[in-house]
Amino acid sequence: MAGDYQEWQIPPANQPKQEDCAFDLSVALASVFALRSEIPDDAFTAQVLGTERAGNGVLIRADGLVLTIGYLVAEAETVWLVSNDGAAIPAHVVAYDHHTGFGLVQALVKVSSPPIPLGNAQMAEAGDPVIIAGHGGMRHALSASIAAKREFAGYWEYLLDEAIFVAPAHPNWGGAALLDRDGKLLGIGSLFMQQVDENDTQTEGNMIVPIDLLNPILDDLLKFGKSQHPQHPWLGAYAAESNGQLFIAGVADGGPAENADIQVGDVILAVAGESVSDLAAMLRKTWSLGSAGVEVPLTLL
């Protein structure tokens, strides 16, 4: 299972150097695992995300608890972790939290690597040096810096008040570890982005989900498999921004938007009578109306 991970590497000049780190780099990198999952053909996310997914996961507890990005394990029936020495480790999904995007899996056999300690993403600043670490040791570790910290809204009805944007981009970003120079975990890799600095300069980088979002919900995730916060209403409408307008780019099969006969190309003018011109404003207004099941009036053009 590990062979294909050895076919590429970060150029040595872009790999982190031990002398620049206040921790044992090789030990920390051994705690980042490859993650592979299999999803049933009839799963809700199968058509968009596929039935076979691959990325990374980060060991955060000595008992084998691994943190990853949720889209890798959403609806997964089978999960495998692969260590840097090629050992395949069976695992199962513990939790997936749509609000943050985090996923948790539990290794089903003992792992020998030490967990990576959690850091404080709130204290990190633009310009700080960081390491983006995928499975595979130094060959798959990238020296980078924080390009920006700002709001992020995703068309799949996802919103972070403050995401971390790093550059350059790691080629295997999904579930990768974002480490500070003390070896602490600042976040988990989520997306490839082309506009990541404060001035929206065309720079390739990654969006990272900050680790600070995990602690408030970790107990719930371990006990219930999801956060116990009220669930946001879901529209099943994939909205996008263009030329100062917010429009419908797609609708989920069988979702509320499709059932309400909302069409691709419709322009969203207002939510519950309040004008909205960007995706973040639309989501915040929608969620302010109540929890899942609430009626959401939309004004469309």
Language-model features: locations:
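C-terminal cap/linker of serine protease catalytic domains
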Residues: 1-25, 113, 139, 181, ...
